[in-house]
Amino acid sequence: MRLSIDMGGTNLRVGRIENGKVVKLVQEPCNAKGTEEEVLEQFYRMIGEVITPEVERIGVAVPSVVDYEQGIVYDVMNIPSWKEVHLKEKLETRFGVKTTVDNDVNCFVNAEYQFGAGKGYNHVVGITLGTGVGAGIVTNGQVYRGANTGAGEICCLPYRDGNYEEYTSSQLFNKWNTTGKDEAEKADQGDETAIARWNELGYHLGKLLQVILYTYDPEVIIIGGGIAQSSFRFEKAMMESLRENFQYPHEIERVKIAFSELKDCNLLGA
């Protein structure tokens, strides 16, 4: 039995996991404006509501850069006070339970590899589309973090007049002074501009998938995050863009591209 913590953009979730299922969950808005210690106290209190003597491990999914070996969290964007938090050490000292801390997208792909669309494959890439873009990599059945825990930061690669994140996340809608939610509603009503915007997102995402295939050559790519819930609006344009001028067409026919259907990925993969 283990306990998992998901530090989302706005909410903090703590769940107890048994046999790959969340059996108890507490959730509340994260005290994002609190001091380092105030946020930690929120952690401690919520963990205390869920933990039992049978819990053998605590796993934490963090939306930031993490030193996986040391369990140190750096520069959490939505929590300004968290510049360098030795989270593994603090939780192990407080609860006496072995703790691991990892980037949330690594947790996402780990969950998909074990329980979701990546089950049965050895080489998996998972990407999440939301306010930003992240990627997690499983190779030979292990999460690959790189020498300095920076593997998978494909969002930072140059693209057009910026980088891929600016064109494959909600930042693209920001360029149009709108939101994905608004454009989804308009597209459903037949608005041609909104439909074109979702197709443009799909086009850029197809180019990002080309990068993933060229660099990682996975068996399966799994797409998750809030924007992925609108996959039916951009999937066709995405696949057309992926095939356009791709140098190894046979690779596209072999790779599986799936949209995540797994709930509580970050909790299950932490």
List the predicted regions and their residue ranges.
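Phosphate-binding/catalytic loop of phosphoryl-transfer enzymes
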Residues: 57-59, 65-164, 268-270
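ATP-binding/phosphotransfer module of carbohydrate and carboxylate kinases, centering on a glycine-rich
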Residues: 1-57, 67-70, 89-97, 112-121, ...
